[in-house]
Amino acid sequence: MKLDFTRKNAIPKKYFIGIKSIKMQTFGWRLLDLDGFSLMTFWAQYGEFIKLALIFVAIIILLKFKIPLSGAIGIGAVLTVALYGIPVLDSLMIAGKSMISEATIMVLLNCYLITFLQRMMELRGHLDLAQRSLSRLFNSRRVNASIAPVFIGLLPSPGAIFIAGSMVDTACGDYISKEDKTFVASYFRHIPESFLPTYSSIILACQLTGVQMGAFVLGMVPMVACLMLLGYLFYLRKVPKETGEAASTDKLADLQSLCRSLWTIAVIILLIVVLNVPVYIATVGVIIVYFFTSRFTWQEIKLFFLSALEARIVINTFVVMIFKDLLTHTNVITALPGLFEALPIPSFLVFGLIFFVGTIVAGSTAIITLCLPMAFAAVSGAGMPLMVFLMSCTYAAMQISPTHLCLTLACEHFKTDFGALVKRTLPVIGIFYVILTGYYILLNLFF
């Protein structure tokens, strides 16, 4: 059929529809492939990380709507299974193994024992005595709310947050909100975790890199001071310094009272650090000695066997551990270097991002094991400065990670929202990262 294109409506409708279809298809392909950009290629390269982002955004939104943390993370676990296509049977097996794994059992056991010890100390008034002794020694609520959690933080157990939280609650009173108290207790309790060799992550990092433990601890001292200062400037200065108690007239007697009130914690720490005794064995031993030295009776402590086992803590522990193991199963953490390597920034910052994101997703141990040797091989002149930088990145990321069980326990202790804790922590670690970057550059000038 011959067509006259000069006449209006000369093209039959069926040809017009065909031409329109071709145009739409062409337009569609231009959307998919515009100047070399392909959505298919983009999804292949970044799809796994988009899924990860969606999971964490969903958790944040759920927390915003006051969904309990266990429920929000539980839904996050379900989304992980759905988005990453983990077979249902496999996901159930992962969940089951996670619930009965040695790591989960040890966390629950240590939390139970520390809570049991806390109940005993409260019954004998030793936590209150520690507060009064600190108040008389320093006459400062701010010292009580910061130094006490740091000391308790020497104990490498998630359950230590309960004792730290109790002391912060008493020291801060009604001068700050319970959300602020949650931050103060969690933040200062975790500062020792950033540099002390009582924590397995520090030991593992030194073993993998060959950096001397003493050199690392010395290199971390300025950053520890920075953490203390930032915590004070953001929140502790809201608390009045004065305790309302008379200044000490006998410092030695007050120091003895402090030692008498906290000797149980000190002995557990010494057993762990000096003799390498497992936390649960050290705690059981101290509880037995404490029972006799403080003349407890069976009637006094028998209720603690049940009250120290709190259902919500058990549930939260199971949910967090399952979520972390499901994320680890996706292997998304192993693809992080490919995501950040093309960024136009120095290599140490690339690995800083990898460690930050990887720690939020899978925790410190996983990212240290997988990526620390890679970082030391890729960054020229790697040594103590790089380890200080990367371990600080890991530490800071743990303070906002939903896979960090201690944060969950802190929120449970104060009955606060996890999102509120993250909101208060982000500005602090943001400034910490800026200072840390400058400190790394400075260290490289001398080491």
State what each model feature region is.
Residues P68, M106, Q118-G125, G153-A164, ...:
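Short helix-coil transition sites and intra-membrane helix breaks within transmembrane domains
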Residues R237-L262, W298-S307:
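Flexible interhelical linker loops that connect adjacent transmembrane helices
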Residues N110-L113, S135-M167, L343-Y395:
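Hydrophobic alpha-helical transmembrane segments of multi-pass integral membrane proteins
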Residues V78-V88, R142-I147, L252-S261, E310-F323, ...:
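Small-residue-rich segments of transmembrane alpha-helices in multi-pass membrane proteins
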Residues L34-F116, L129-S133, I265-P344:
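Hydrophobic transmembrane alpha-helices of multi-pass solute/ion transporters
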Residues S201, F216-L229, T359-L370, F376-F447:
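C-terminal transmembrane helix pair
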Residues V143-L208, G383-A420:
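Alpha-helical membrane segments and immediately flanking helix-loop junctions
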